[in-house]
Amino acid sequence: MMSRFGIGALALAALAVPLAAFAAGEEPAAAPMLTEEQVTKGRQMFQDNGCNACHTLADANAAGTVGPSFDGNANLDKGHAVQVITSGQGPMPSFGWLGDEDIDLIATYVVQVKK
């Protein structure tokens, strides 16, 4: 049986690698590249769900000014995009009803095509 010290040391070791990566300023893992068919579907979903009314994204011919522009947004990463699409943030409503697969596709699309 492992002592409390051993369990604590094991837990600390498990956190060390991710924390070291964070402290070193490493970038989050890149979103996987979409096929042309997936890009087309992502673009269509972006437009059909009204994302283009608030956000700027050249690939989707979107010039909204209410929400942040995705073009040239170096801080936009897939994980954050999934979180905001799912739960909403500020004036943006939640789109959690879309389901995980569709949310993942939209987030990956936006991150992949931003200029």
Task: Label each region the model flagged.
Residues 39-43, 47, 53-87, 97:
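Gly/Gly-Pro-rich "capping" loops immediately C-terminal to redox-active cysteine motifs
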